[in-house]
């Protein structure tokens, strides 16, 4: 009996080891496939232009060209590009955090006529592709004489339907009794939002910060249209 139990235990350990090995092997392969483009990019940064798309791929350049990392700072105003990107990204992120959390509080904790219809209409704009209204936006910015200014991008990206939806879902999980108690104590709606809802919503704000920061930083078509 004892021998059978020991054999079953050993067999179970062997099966667990094999299953874990296969899982980790699969994950390592997937990770390697995801890292390949970054490795190719790093390798290409040390090559001449004519060697970048050579075939077969030379992963380790025979004559690494370190001068490329000097030229990128001297031949184009890269530092200016980075400063502008950081400026726009930080401002847009802060604006979206403010507008999204503020609007979400109204939709989640306040009662007013047509609230649900207005919320659904606003969220429905997520389904409209940006390409459908980028030309009207460009014309609007032109009429306001904001083209070729950072303010154009900041104004257009200061509001986010996704951000409002995300924050509203979080605020609905906060007990309404907290807001009612604050109102009884004489706190205004602005005070409730600032002193109660914002401190409680740091996890949701952190998530929205990451999404907004990455999307704004990676935006290429917007600056190409409004800043050139």
What are these regions (language model features)?
Residues 4-5, 11-15, 19-228:
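A structural signal for multi-pass alpha-helical bundles of membrane permease subunits
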